[in-house]
Amino acid sequence: GKSSILKALYSEKKIICGEAKIGQTDLKQLKENEIPFLRRKIGIIFQDFKLLKDRNVFKNLEFVLKATGWNDSKIRKEKIESCLKKVHILDLINKFPNQLSGGQKQKVAIARALLNDPEIILADEPTGNLDPISSIEVMNVLREINESGNTILMATHDFSLLEKFKGRIIVCRNGEISEMDYDKLKIEKVYA
């Protein structure tokens, strides 16, 4: 259910009933030719990093900017360096994916999600393939991004992340979505 909701918000899955909006965009009324424009407003982070193996970090990020219409190479370079600074890996700009740890790859994926100054960031199990230390590093970066004003909607099954990085919690249960208080969720987890 968690990943399906994120896919619906990203317009990878069609919304059949109910209502969903990103900003002023009604996802149920969205036309096929409007999807690329919507996706420029959304940053997405998957648990599998999906980096291009034959390109270094700079070229991986530049590929996204070129694909979304950024034609000025000077502006692309500035945006890439700015996003890499935000996730604390500017020093890895010339490294290839096979030279990066899992946590570093995920930070590249987060930088990629920030490139187009998204209105919202969708993070689908962003620490799912990481060791505990890398998970904490990635979550700290996401917290910094959130505290700087970006909205992040994260799907996770990792209860320990909810304990360490508290925020608003939305629970998917039996096809229903509801907001839940952390303490109530903790009690339900204990007695489940």
Model-predicted regions and their roles:
Residues 115-119:
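A short, proline-enriched helix->beta-strand linker immediately N-terminal to the Walker B motif
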Residues 132-134:
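Helix N-cap at the start of a conserved alpha-helix in ABC-type nucleotide-binding domains
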Residues 25-26, 62, 66-69, 73-92:
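Conserved ABC ATPase "signature" region
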Residues 18-26:
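Conserved ABC transporter NBD signature motif
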Residues 10:
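Helix-to-loop junction immediately C-terminal to a conserved catalytic motif
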Residues 96-100, 104-106:
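Conserved ABC ATPase signature
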Residues 121-124:
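Catalytic Walker B motif of ABC-type/P-loop ATPase nucleotide-binding domains
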